[in-house]
């Protein structure tokens, strides 16, 4: 599937492109043990690392606007790359609000509670119950329970999605204990259902998964379990089912009915959209909805423009983004990824802008229809590479951005052999890309948005399925037609202090475009020490 843009300008002379290849989840860790990056056979990237300018940059914590020691993720990573500056992320923004007890003054939440009390409906709070900090945080859920208590809401049902992907695979009981303690201390709420995120938080249009979560929430005939939340989780473990895949289970008689209200506390949109659309959209064709309730929905952040929901923390607009600079200078750009990472190279890289910019073409390659990607670690990398090469060969794009999902999506499986195969496939694809770029004299900048597959076993000896706080590599292969004036063959990359926010300024430097003042990141290309001469033409400050 490809997106077209009639505003793309066609130039008879082929353009030497600058290509940004994002190897999603390809972090750097020196140790070889349990490291699917180091253990993979990657002759292309190994050779480029040794032969061309390279460095390591930070992709987690404060360097991407997250709390210290908080692992990075694809949304935050691409947002930071595209913005060229460090942005306070939603995790920090909402955490500060909860910490300062300011949920009680949030206008959207207060209007929501007033409407709910007036109608006498039940408040249903749902979302990912963990401290992973990628899609949600348990502190936000605790804050919501306290908010509900402060507003005098008596009928409160919690529908909790178990993690096991951004956390340890069998850690759900720890979070359930925290929530049960909060329920006891406030006297508000009950855990009404449990469901693994595999079912409730799909983002790949696997509607058969979303429908199972939907039925759990809406079907009055859904079987009521006699087990407690903890007992249900332990039963799943006994059956070999970890947190991510826990089957939907109803723990109380509460389900969504007309006049009820839902607060969805995930702050990251991509894995919350499908379920919200199923719950709220009138025109919906993902699956047949047998039990549609007339409910109000409030989401913590804007999951998608145009959704008929209230938003507690609306987006803060960003300007002077990488894509906008390219577009404003009349240049064409191409963005491509497979399904799992398509929103990241488009929506997130553009700072939350839904529609393509002038001169921007987007191309989606479908991800394979498998239960988990360790079953097909190559994913759709070959098809993705072939489509990107066609775009490069067309000679009409100044900037090309491609995301390889394999290291991250297969890394999440925790299966070492599969992650190694995934990384080897990406390495071979980078080689094909480089050959195509070289024919036009273009430049290639290789990096990652966060770490993952470089650590497959955690400190507890269990499979590590989450992201990491490790740095990520950057390699610059400068093309003959993209040589920066004055550097010759002596171009070097900054060896310390770099982060994802420095990538947009670096790309603009390679494209010989000015960096906007709003971009506080700095080019990773080291300045050259030219002898002082009179009347030199001032150069842009990157």
UniProtKB/Swiss-Prot annotation:
The residues that hold substrate are: 135, 165-166, 197, 203, 268-271, 341
Q: Which residues bind Mn(2+) 1?
A: 408, 412, 467
Q: Name one GO biological process term.
A: glucose catabolic process
Q: Where is the active site?
A: 74 (phosphoserine intermediate)
Spell out the family assignment given in the record's similarity comment. Answer: Belongs to the BPG-independent phosphoglycerate mutase family.
Q: Does the keyword Metal-binding apply?
A: yes
Residues bound to Mn(2+) 2 are 24, 74, 449-450
For this protein, the record's Pfam families field holds: iPGM_N, Metalloenzyme
EC number assigned by the record: 5.4.2.12
Q: Name one GO molecular function term.
A: phosphoglycerate mutase activity
What function is annotated for this protein?
Catalyzes the interconversion of 2-phosphoglycerate and 3-phosphoglycerate.
Q: What is this protein called?
A: 2,3-bisphosphoglycerate-independent phosphoglycerate mutase
InterPro entries to which the protein is assigned, alphabetical: Alkaline_phosphatase_core_sf, BPG-indep_PGM_N, Metalloenzyme, PGAM_B_sf, Pgm_bpd_ind
What is the superkingdom listed in this entry's lineage? Bacteria
- What's in the GO CC field? cytosol
Q: What reaction(s) does this enzyme catalyze? A: (2R)-2-phosphoglycerate = (2R)-3-phosphoglycerate
Q: Subunit details for this protein?
A: Monomer.
Q: Describe cofactor binding as the record notes it.
A: Binds 2 manganese ions per subunit.
Q: Which cofactor does it need?
A: Mn(2+)
**What are the record keywords, sorted?**
Glycolysis, Isomerase, Manganese, Metal-binding
Q: Native species of this protein?
A: Prochlorococcus marinus (strain NATL1A)
